[in-house]
Amino acid sequence: MEFLLHILAGAAVGFAIGLTGVGGGSLMTPLLLLFGYPAPVAIGTDLLYAAITKAGGAVSHHRRGNVDWKIVGLLAAGSIPVSILLHSFFLDISFQESPGFESLLTFSLGVMLIVTATILIFRDKIRLNAVEERPEFFMHTIHRSRSTVTFAMGLLLGACVTLSSVGAGAFGAAILMTIYSQTSAAKIIGTDIAHAVPLTFIAGLGYLSSGYVDLMLLGSLLVGSLPAIHLGSKASNQVPDKVLQQILIVLLLGLGIYYSFI
């Protein structure tokens, strides 16, 4: 019965991912916490779930020429070492057994859910500002130090994703949209997904090595979600985008506030 429930949960989140493009960490990790899984297990399992579900999308975007591998490399040069360093710290048993361990993870999750919801609220404004409304000196500064800024943002993403499993989607795309304002939306999304795969995989392996991944749970979630993502993407043209976005924002804000203050 529990296995069936996990398959249905995977299908629900997978359908949401296909429908909206958001939901891997933002919905799956809170759902696993509601099922009663400890925060490290929920985050670790979701990270490997995200790596597997995003891999197909990365391949698809690469085939269409929608991945800038130079940007992926710059982001990964910052994010992956940070993830490994954080896991080296977490692997200290005395810290894992302290009351602050789970509290740090749930607080990080709550903050990132609020950040993701805020980005969704202002997504159109961010896109408009990135192309039309930024001061010339700001554009010049960003362009001149773009590689350094991208590397620095990789450091930030590595920390956020490792601590919360959230951030590789909407947050990462918003960062890229700001830095690379002349790049097409399709290439921004493809590049963001391509970077998310190695980051979530490495971060997930760190949790797995500490015993914080439930492989049976992971398998059942994938059984439900992989076909559901395809169905959700097909249904996305039939459902008003505004309605979906508003429901998602309310849900993410509510969960974010809850996990930030419990």
Q: What is the role of each PLM region?
A:
Residues 1-9, 35, 63-163, 178, ...:
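Juxtamembrane transmembrane-helix boundary motif
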Residues 23-24, 55, 81, 85, ...:
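Residue positions within transmembrane alpha-helices of multi-pass solute transporters
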Residues 28-41, 171-187:
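Interfacial segments of multi-pass membrane proteins
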Residues 30, 46, 87-88, 170, ...:
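Transmembrane alpha-helix boundary and packing residues in multipass membrane permease domains
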